[in-house]
């Protein structure tokens, strides 16, 4: 966990050697074709993850309730959402689908046991929207346009300055922060706008530290 202090001496040193990860192209292409043709054909795939990792209260602190996250999944022409969530995500996706939301859960992919297959699933997506968990690191390592819904209880890697709107680890990862007073409302609004604008690559400062 402390290797970065020896390898990188300044914030500007991060993010210069991307992509850090590469998926198997044949598996990536296969999954993408299947997902786009699932039901009514779609044009774009957005990977999603709403539950954080850890133990006990830490999971709750990093997560967004499914009924709240569903607000982000309201239909956008040509867009299909793909669950990248590890753990027992199937029942939640089934509930969303009953509500008419276009979300896929691929039961063949277990991120906790099949990391290579899961990474191909992430790479099959055009963009990713996720809370801060392994999904962010997979998407960021691939260089996929990503928006991180960042909890107030985030750790040192993300900085706590609200002026920081992009990850210095992964230049393709933007940050929408939970706020002390407003909760998730402003971050959710920011995320929905990002989705409707086609999930552009993020811009903005990666640090409030002097260069």
Model-derived regions, located:
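Catalytic machinery of carbohydrate-active enzymes
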Residues: 1-211
